[in-house]
Amino acid sequence: VLTEGPLDAASSERIAEYGRSGTNDLPSRLSQGAIWRIEKALRRRADQRGETWLIPPSNPIYFETYTSGVRPWAAFFSIWAACLDWPHSMDAEGYDIAVKLRKRVIAMESLEEQLAVLDAIPVERIVRQLDDAEGWDNYARDYVRLFMDGDLEGIIALSSRFVTRGPIVIGVRDQRMFEVMQPVFDAGDAVAFVGFPHVPGVTHLFREAGYAVEQVTA
């Protein structure tokens, strides 16, 4: 079983700790309107968990909590997951199943490589995504629909502006993943969990190398 990077508990904690060991200037880059839209979404999620304010604070305390003392990408992903109330990860679930089945798990990138990629995400892309927080619910619904339909091209088009869809995150990493996958797949009885943005590039490299690649949908 191949995964993009290490997914064990210790590695996940190191990523979280690293994300908490930085700063950002997101509050100064975002308009007050954008900040309050995010604050409203965060408060709505908190209200659903029974944390309703009798008299709501006049300052964006949730936004401040999520953006204080963390790296830009850590702030974004924390806000994104909280606003959408989406704690799931297909990669992590695949890893857990593989461990339970006692399968050999291979990380295609080191933790250090993955952290470097996260730090390289342009802040401008993060700001742009946060500016569009009002449309996140619609984005999530469209994403799920396209995913369930197996519409890869539709997903690529929908998510082209997402923070991790730039050339820094894709591109070179596709080649790296292909090089790790190839000998493992040649040996047989293998599966790889990768983010869908990598699928076009990786499958292209496999086809160029003479492999037959077929999309299978339920």
State what each model feature region is.
Residues 163-218:
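A cross-kingdom marker for long, charged
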Residues 1-165:
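Structured, acidic catalytic/metal-binding patches in enzyme active sites
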